[in-house]
Amino acid sequence: MKAAKLPIVVSVLNHKGGVGKTTTTANLGAGLARQGLKVLLIDLDVQANLTHQMVGDLEANEPNICEALLEEKPLTSILRPTGTKGLFIAPAGESLIELDLNLFNKFGREYVLKNSIAQTEGISSFDVVLIDNPPYISLATVNSLAASDFYLVPVSCEYLPMMGLKYLQKTISRIQKVNPALKPLGVALTMYDKRESIGQSVAELLREELADQVFETMIRVNTKIKGSPSTQQTIFQFENDPKGRGTLDFTAFTQEVMGRLNLQKGAEV
């Protein structure tokens, strides 16, 4: 019997917080869904900011990604639709803080998430899975990267990032022993402000060091991007304007990502 086609899995990560990691995950996911693709978001960050933005905070007893992984179950029972057609989430809850401790003694602990994704009923109907990771290395991060085809690194243009990127690359190199197929999708420049010289310096430095790994689109500083999570909306919903700055930036970024992943758009939402 022919195996079901699995979606492309992308880990979104950076060891530094406050770089737009969750914002990038949420709005890229929405951008892909708006292009007619079916997208699954997985929240592995104990802060659960992605979950809050997409579906609100979970009650303490509601099942979430932690229970699915620890019980080695498919994700079917915890998947939730979001306010964007074609965009779903496997949410995080309070119990996620215990994930590393409970995974530690499991056999094949690096592959628990990969197995859960593969066992999820209907997973072949998804085109892309985006995983939001905590801003530090953990067993959750190892699971994410072991399950992924690509990794995407958001970098804020508000500070020079090279030391952090070198440390992250060391982590990736170690993980590639577990998942040799893991490849870089690219570096996404966030919080770009043309009025600040540091932003231009960061962009130039990264393009010099990493060449075409850096996406052409730069996500500009935008109060609406910062404000949309508190309203449980993506930038597309919050601006509700095809010419809005955030909408334009994330639409362009989404199209670049689709090009790198060789994804064709479906019926646009």
What are these regions (language model features)?
Residues M1-V269:
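P-loop NTP-binding core
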